[in-house]
Amino acid sequence: MTENSDKVPITMVGPEDVEFCSPPAYATVTVKPSGSPTRLLKVGAVVLISGAVLLLFGAIGAFYFWKGNDNHIYNVHYTMSINGRLQDASMEIDAANNLETFKMGSGAEEAIEVNDFQNGITGIRFAGGEKCYIKAQVKARIPEVSTGTKQSISELEGKIMPVKYEENSLIWVAVDQPVKDNSFLSSKILEFCGDLPIFWLKPMYPKEIPRERREVVRSSAPSTTRRPHSEPRGNAGPGRLSNRTRPSVQDDEEPFNPDNPYHQQEGESMTFDPRLDHEGICCIECRRSYTHCQKICEPLGGYYPWPYNYQGCRSACRVVMPCSWWVARILGMV
């Protein structure tokens, strides 16, 4: 009886007493191995899924960014034949920044012209040059490059465009002193010029030009409107005040050309600012593009009349489109 009274019935042992029956080491070994691999697998799965989602959104964003830039920037490459020598050139239209950039040549012969239509400033610089040149131009707003614009410009791709220099063409000569306060210049032009000193360009004509220009202005001053259709083309002087002819000092004696819409006076509502033609931005009477080169020269002291007032001329060339195309596509006015 004494031996039986010392025994504890199994039914008297509660659930809390089971913990004390198990060794501590055994409990530790069974808990840790079962939880650690599962947690690592979950973290790895979350990282992989997050990375895949980020890559997907990045690809979508890059696609739309590229697609958006394609509507704002368009490049075309062509070749110019200057005095029998071929040179590579390119034109870039950046509608987002309202810029038009022309490049000619490469290496030490490279010339770059940037037209800032937002602020009405043109910047020109040459490779290896010690100056950056600016001149005023018309202000405009470049629309997005549409499919029609691309098709029109793509006709220049791969073509060899001859360059014709006119002996009595306008010459741009830098002023003596650089610009001291450049706060009026946009960040685009300042970035384009970099650390180079900036000089204004002033137009100058060769020796025989001033007298002819004065005669042209006198002959065209009484009438600033377009010439009537019945009037012969050879009777009116090609002055700058005429809105139907190119500002040139040469005699305008072209025969009637039925293929030229300006000879037929089609589209009476389409008139152009002569400054567009005079500054080489577009050609009023042209139906096809051509290459326009302008001479950028350094001032030379001494006697004023030509050729003693400038030296060291270099050429900067660009494509000039017909004004009908330029106004419709670039200015977006038509």
Curated annotation (Swiss-Prot):
Prosegment residue ranges: 211-214
Alphabetical keyword list: Chondrogenesis, Cleavage on pair of basic residues, Developmental protein, Differentiation, Disulfide bond, Extracellular matrix, Glycoprotein, Membrane, Secreted, Transmembrane, Transmembrane helix
Tissue specificity remark: Detected in cartilage, cardiac valves and valvular interstitial cells (at protein level). Expressed in eye.
Location of the BRICHOS domain: 105-201
InterPro entries (alphabetical): BRICHOS_dom, Chondromodulin/Tenomodulin
Pfam families (alphabetical): BRICHOS (PF04089)
GO biological process: cartilage development; endothelial cell morphogenesis; negative regulation of angiogenesis; negative regulation of endothelial cell proliferation; negative regulation of vascular endothelial growth factor receptor signaling pathway
One GO CC annotation: extracellular region
Top-level division of the source organism's lineage: Eukaryota
Residues linked to a glycan: 243
The keyword Transmembrane helix appears for this protein: yes
Annotated TM spans: 46-66
Region (Disordered): 212-268
Post-translational modification: After cleavage, the post-translationally modified ChM-I is secreted as a glycoprotein.
Cysteines engaged in disulfide bonds, as pairs: 132-193, 282-286, 283-323, 293-317, 297-313
Functional summary from the UniProt entry: Bifunctional growth regulator that stimulates the growth of cultured chondrocytes in the presence of basic fibroblast growth factor (FGF) but inhibits the growth of cultured vascular endothelial cells. May contribute to the rapid growth of cartilage and vascular invasion prior to the replacement of cartilage by bone during endochondral bone development. Inhibits in vitro tube formation and mobilization of endothelial cells. Plays a role as antiangiogenic factor in cardiac valves to suppress neovascularization.
Family, similarity comment: Belongs to the chondromodulin-1 family.
Name this protein carries in UniProt: Leukocyte cell-derived chemotaxin 1
Lineage: Eukaryota, Metazoa, Chordata, Craniata, Vertebrata
